[in-house]
């Protein structure tokens, strides 16, 4: 028999979703306001989407969504429904926020607005990294996930004695390194700052 959730359970879940949403807003703003305008990328499926966007112009949010849709087919079967539900919510919301902020954070010509000025790649990199890292930290600390390498890491962690932080770092290093070799530009690499369970990565 399935027990009926208590009021405290409902409030706890509601709190999780509120903070997950706030974390996603910070993450999406870090990308659209500071990373995309300066063609900087990080690890994760958002980073893969950024590489595709810089190379082809294909919208970052749709690459992110398509990749995660594939990964979620595996996550639903392997990981618990609670993880899958919150991850699905985060994927849809982050896709929306990336799309929305790219519509409004533009210059007079409709191009991504460089908020900290032209040539300020390093400063934009630092600010964007902090916003993205804080956002991801809030999401993870409230039992959420943005999908992508987080899903891969969670699946591996379930069967192998490998910490989430190490697995995510490994995936991020591959993504960021491939970006450098493809474009041969240091600006497209980023010190990936995140919650305490992650390690710093740099290409």
State the predicted function of each range.
Residues 1-13:
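Short, Lys/Arg-rich, polar N-terminal cytosolic tail immediately upstream
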Residues 55-65, 121-126:
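Structural signature of hydrophobic alpha-helical transmembrane segments
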Residues 83-93:
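Cytoplasmic-side transmembrane-helix entry/capping segments in multi-pass membrane proteins
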Residues 29, 51, 72-74, 96, ...:
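Alpha-helical transmembrane segments of multipass membrane proteins
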Residues 92-104, 121-142, 163-164:
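Mid-bilayer segments of alpha-helical transmembrane spans in multi-pass integral membrane proteins
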Residues 23, 70-82, 142, 154:
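C-terminal ends of transmembrane helices
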Residues 47-57, 150-158:
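Short amphipathic alpha-helical coupling elements at transmembrane boundaries
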Residues 191-203:
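Single conserved hydrophobic/aromatic residue that forms the stacking wall/gate
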């Amino acid at each position: 028999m399935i027990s009926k959730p208590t009021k405290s359970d409902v409030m706890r879940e509601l709190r999780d979703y509120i903070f997950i949403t706030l974390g996603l807003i910070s993450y999406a703003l870090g990308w659209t306001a500071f990373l995309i305008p300066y063609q900087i990328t990080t690890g994760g499926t958002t980073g893969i989407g950024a590489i595709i966007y810089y190379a082809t112009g294909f919208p970052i949010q749709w690459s992110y969504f398509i990749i995660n849709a594939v990964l979620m087919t595996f996550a639903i079967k392997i990981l618990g429904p609670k993880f899958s539900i919150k991850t699905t919510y985060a994927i849809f919301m982050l896709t929306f926020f990336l799309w929305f902020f790219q519509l409004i954070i533009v210059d007079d010509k409709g191009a991504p607005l460089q908020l900290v000025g032209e040539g300020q790649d390093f400063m934009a990199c630092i600010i964007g990294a902090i916003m993205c890292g804080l956002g991801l930290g809030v999401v993870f600390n409230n039992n959420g996930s943005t999908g992508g390498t987080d899903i891969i890491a969670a699946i591996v962690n379930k069967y192998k004695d490998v910490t989430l932080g190490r697995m995510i770092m490994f995936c991020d290093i591959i993504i960021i390194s491939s970006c450098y070799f493809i474009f041969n530009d240091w600006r497209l690499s980023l010190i990936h700052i995140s919650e305490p369970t992650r390690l710093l990565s740099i290409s």
